[in-house]
Amino acid sequence: MHVLYSTSAHILPSGRHINVARTPWLRLDIVSIIGILLHSGPIAGFSINMIIFRDAFIPLTKVIENKKMNNIISYSYIYIYIYICHITVENPGDITDKHYTRMNVSHYYIIT
């Protein structure tokens, strides 16, 4: 298991892209996510303490752009576990594709 640590990320619902610090834009196939775990927290508009994406796929062509990861790429698609904390929506009253969801990523696991 190879672990990368990040502090912030952005996700655009329509494009399903997530930008993790020190990594390039990685496209996530949200449909391929097998499980999502939500931990309850104080909801003021829209906020989530933690969300876990399991078994999401990232295309190799996007990942290979990051030279730091070149040595761990061994498959055309790799499994990714993302642990995301403190998600807040820019405009809680109108969650649409026009708005970005800002989040902090506590751990970023690359499993090859």
From Swiss-Prot:
Keyword check for Membrane: yes
Transmembrane segment boundaries: 33-53, 69-89
UniProtKB keywords: Membrane, Transmembrane, Transmembrane helix
Main localisation: membrane
GO cellular component: membrane
Entry membrane topology: Multi-pass membrane protein
Location in or out of the cell: Membrane
Protein name: Putative uncharacterized protein YOL166C
Organism of this sequence: Saccharomyces cerevisiae (strain ATCC 204508 / S288c)
